Structure formats: structure tokens, C-alpha cells
Amino acid sequence: MAYSKIRQPKLSDVIEQQLEFLILEGTLRPGEKLPPERELAKQFDVSRPSLREAIQRLEAKGLLLRRQGGGTFVQSSLWQSFSDPLVELLSDHPESQYDLLETRHALEGIAAYYAALRSTDEDKERIRELHHAIELAQQSGDLDAESNAVLQYQIAVTEAAHNVVLLHLLRCMEPMLAQNVRQNFELLYSRREMLPLVSSHRTRIFEAIMAGKPEEAREASHRHLAFIEEILLDRSREESRRERSLRRLEQRKN
């Protein structure tokens, strides 16, 4: 029987694959600067020439960007997002916000489920910090800070799900999500009695993730977004009634 020779993988190939994995899973984020070459070689316990070769190949693939005298960075355009014209187009058509909410139902429900199932202690600490940041922003009545904290919180939950496709989808949708979250808070701040209810829904998601209860986390996420959707529908109905009343007044004048 003939045996084929086992070929050891080239060290630079192993380093390249490891860096690709760190980028793919989100440990190395778009725009993030890599540690200096000497430090990175020490962390990987490899020679600097092997590391340099791996980095050069990742540059050629468009995953890394080397700046003269400034270090090496993960490409900031790695997660190609929806274009600004598309975001503007969606904002000009309010009915599209319901489509986005339906999409959020699916993505955020799955993210909460797997975050409860897979989150590490570090993930949970990050989620806890952002949940607290949301509470502080709401107490101070800072709409900008609260909407930004909510977006960062959802990104942290999705990262904690440890599903690279899910994270990529969220990154692509980030401009639209930021706008949607902001618009929702503008409405909520005009009906401040709703804010405590929204907070209680979010707290249930948070507690389910922290307790490692995936089904409860997913259900809490669905209830939260269903509540937001109902508030939007109420506003739409109110606006329709107001428009009808104005039309009737105009008809009477004529």
C-alpha cells in the first residue's frame, strides 16, 4: 500500500487563516488597527517574516490596509453597507419602516436567542455596560445618546450570538437601523409615557440573555418590536384621522 507524504501547512498560511477568522468573527473590526508587527508576532509566537507574508496576502485580498508610517488596519469598507441614497429613499417613504421592523423581528429575535445560548462572560459584560448606558441616557432625557446606545447594544447582542452571517447582515443594515432607531425615539419622546414600557420590554430581553434562556430572549425581542410597531400604527391612525378632519373642515368652508 502506497502512502502519500503528509505536507505541513506553511506557517504564513496558518497566520493568514487565523487573521481571516478574527476578521470574519468580528474580533478584528472594520477600521481597527492591528498591533505593531513585533507585538503581533509575539502574540502568535511566529517569526516576523512569516507574519509579514501573511499580512501582505491579506492586503492583496483587500482585507487589510497598510498606511505608510501609520500601521496596518482592517479595511473600513469591509462590511459594505446599504448606500446613502437607499437610506434616504427609505426615509422618504415612511411605510418602508414597517418592512424594516419586520426584518428586525427576524434578525434581532435570532440574535437574542443565540446570544443567550452562546455569549461569553466578556460578551455579557459588554451587553451589561450598554444596557446601563441606555438607562442613563433615558434618565437624562438625551435622545441622541439613547438612540446611539440602543444601536450599539443591538450590535453587541448580535456579536454575542457568534454567527458571522448574522453579524454581517447587521453591519450592512447599520445605517438603516440607526435611522430607524432614531425615528422611533423621536416618536417615543413625543409620547414620553411610553418610554417606561419600552424600557421594561428591553430589560426582559437583557435579563433572558444574562440568564441563558434563549427562547425567553427571542420571545421578549418579538414582544418588544411588536410594541414599537403598534405605537407606529397608532400614530399613523391618528394622522389619518387628523387629515380627514382637516379635509372635512375645508369642505365646509367651500
From Swiss-Prot:
Residues 37-56 bind DNA. PROSITE patterns: HTH_GNTR. Pfam families: FCD (PF07729), GntR (PF00392). One of its GO terms (biological process) is positive regulation of DNA-templated transcription. Gene3D superfamilies: GntR ligand-binding domain-like (1.20.120.530), Winged helix-like DNA-binding domain superfamily/Winged helix DNA-binding domain (1.10.10.10). Transcriptional repressor for the pyruvate dehydrogenase complex genes aceEF and lpd. This is Pyruvate dehydrogenase complex repressor. It comes from Escherichia coli (strain K12).
